[in-house]
């Protein structure tokens, strides 16, 4: 049993996250002075999500009654997730699951089964190439991401492209269907088994029994970092 959810965090995590604990500490102190404050905060956040959902519903209702409904691709996503106290943290600015897990819904005429759900993690670099595919543009040689069209057609399709996120300089996380691997700029690491620990309570990075998994994920992240970018934005073409 751990004394706190930060007890098994490595030095890199503590350095990156320590100055972001003010929100959690402040909310904890407020809840002690005014019991129920934390519950009110969570309810307020849920209410904001509910309101946003209702407005999306209004847009979709309007689209359904328009002449372009059957020729429109709908994509719904968020730029980040949000902690509401998980890992003793509130807001985003982290490499853990809650900060990086976003809603991501794609609806395209004639593609996939309505209401189907895919459990395979992707990152948002799939968005552009997927839209190209859906629009009939097959040449994606200039895209850094991979089209998720195979997953739209079959949510259980083979997918060998782990989701990668970055926060701050040289702090990265890699997510597969089972594992979340985090590597900080100082080389320290976290490893979570989402099959048995979906809340990321226990950091397995220092356990001898998990070193094989850790090494594979470490190599996979390095492979992604070493890959040459498809488009060279450092050498823009002159405008004519």
Q: Predicted regions span which residues?
A:
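Active-site-proximal cap/lid insertion segments
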Residues: 1-121, 134-142, 183, 200, ...
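Surface-exposed alpha-helical segments enriched in charged/polar residues
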Residues: 61, 219-222
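Hydrophobic residues in alpha-helical segments
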Residues: 63, 151-152, 205
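C-terminal cap/loop subdomain of S1 sulfatases and analogous C-terminal strand-loop tails that border
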Residues: 80-86, 112, 123-128, 132-194, ...
């Amino acid at each position: 049993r751990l004394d706190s959810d930060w007890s098994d965090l490595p030095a890199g995590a503590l350095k990156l996250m320590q100055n972001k604990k003010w929100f959690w500490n402040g909310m904890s102190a407020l809840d002690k002075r005014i019991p129920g404050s934390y519950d009110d905060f969570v309810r307020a956040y849920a209410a904001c999500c509910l309101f946003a959902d209702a407005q999306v519903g209004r847009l979709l209702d309007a689209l359904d009654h328009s002449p372009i409904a059957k020729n429109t691709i709908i994509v719904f996503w968020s730029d980040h997730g949000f902690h509401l106290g998980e890992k003793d943290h509130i807001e985003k600015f982290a490499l853990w699951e809650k900060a990086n897990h976003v809603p991501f819904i794609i609806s395209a005429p004639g593609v996939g089964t309505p209401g189907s759900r895919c459990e395979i993690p992707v990152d948002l670099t799939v968005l552009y190439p997927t839209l190209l595919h859906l629009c009939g543009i097959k040449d994606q040689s200039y895209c850094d991401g991979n089209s998720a069209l195979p997953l739209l057609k079959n949510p259980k399709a083979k997918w060998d492209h782990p989701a990668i996120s970055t926060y701050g300089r040289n702090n990265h996380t890699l997510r597969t269907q089972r594992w979340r691997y985090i590597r900080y700029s100082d080389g320290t690491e976290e490893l979570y088994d989402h099959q048995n620990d979906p809340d990321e309570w226990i950091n397995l990075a220092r356990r001898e029994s998990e070193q094989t998994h850790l090494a594979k994920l470490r190599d996979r992240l390095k492979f992604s970092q070493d890959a040459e970018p498809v488009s060279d934005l450092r050498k823009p073409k002159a405008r004519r």
